[in-house]
Amino acid sequence: MGQVFLLMPVLLVSCFLSHGAAIENQRLFNIAVSRVQHLHLLAQKMFNDFDGTLLPDERRQLNKIFLLDFCNSDSIVSPIDKHETQKSSVLKLLHISFRLIESWEYPSQTLIISNSLMVRNANQISEKLSDLKVGINLLITGNQDGVLSLDDNDSQQLPPYGNYYQNLGGDGNVRRNYELLACFKKDMHKVETYLTVAKCRKSLEANCTL
């Protein structure tokens, strides 16, 4: 009986610490989702502003090219649809999100739009991406059980970004900006989706469908 009473405080402290960790985990998820939502909205606005400077024929042509082309981050293996996203573990979604954000740390510094239009807060984009990367890394650390073994998706290297647009031809500057902004918007939407699903799973909500 004495041993039971001795264990009671230990169990209470353990439950308290576990509850505190869960609250902190949700706080970090809330911050991460809020920040990526802001980045996604910013990416959407930047793309729309640039798209609005194009002539109709130019816009159609660039859209056709983009649909047939690929983004630099497409080499990062990620869920191809909502069903795969729902089946993916929280840790997998966090790792993919981390890699996607990491893939934009350098390209974000070149998000300067042609036709004399410059993103006023281009520097802030890089800062926000870096902050979000740190936050996601904290979430990965807080949500892994034991020693994490990295899969191929985590260890692979992206193609050198400097070579990505080297064969665009004479209209490369316009196409480069179009693809940069379109890819940035697409990837921020991906990260927003993955973090939202992961957050929902950890909050034990009844319905986490997309």
Swiss-Prot record:
Instruction: Output the SUPFAM superfamilies linked to this UniProt entry.
Output: 4-helical cytokines
Signal peptide stretch:
1-22
GO CC field: extracellular space
Q: Which InterPro entries match?
A: 4_helix_cytokine-like_core, Somatotropin, Somatotropin/Prolactin, Somatotropin_CS
GO MF annotation terms: growth hormone activity; growth hormone receptor binding; metal ion binding
Binding locations of Zn(2+): H38, E192
Example GO BP: animal organ development
Q: Using the chain's own numbering, where are the disulfide bonds?
A: C71-C183, C200-C208
Outline what the protein does.
Growth hormone plays an important role in growth control and is involved in the regulation of several anabolic processes. Implicated as an osmoregulatory substance important for seawater adaptation.
Designated name of the protein: Somatotropin
